[in-house]
Amino acid sequence: KNKKANYPFWIRNCIEYINQNLHKNLSLLDISNELQMNPAYISNQFKKIVGISLRDYINKRKVEEAKFLIQCTNVSLLEISTTLSFADQSHFSKVFKKYTDISPNQYKNKLKK
């Protein structure tokens, strides 16, 4: 699963930037400014090389981080959604459910059992 090592340098930089900025409301423009590259090129090539869209990648990483925070802290779901810069808690729930098939609440309750 360590395909990352084979990614072009700019993709690795892009992924690193995303990972370091999960708490921000990241946009394609932020990333293109950071990498000093054309946004359309980034968007097109990221999907071609990584296999999912940049937005999907960012959201998946945010959900992974949310799962970690739910498992390892007592932080409320509202705080988690705020920390990860989701528009609001319902948007957080929607995105979380899209990638896990369950809501953050259901996930949290499953861990308690």
Question: PLM features: what roles do these ranges have?
Answer:
Residues 1-16, 37-43:
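An amphipathic alpha-helical interaction segment
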Residues 27-39:
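Aromatic-anchored, glycine/proline-accented short structural segments
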Residues 15-16, 20, 25, 29, ...:
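Terminal helix-turn-helix DNA-binding modules in bacterial transcription factors
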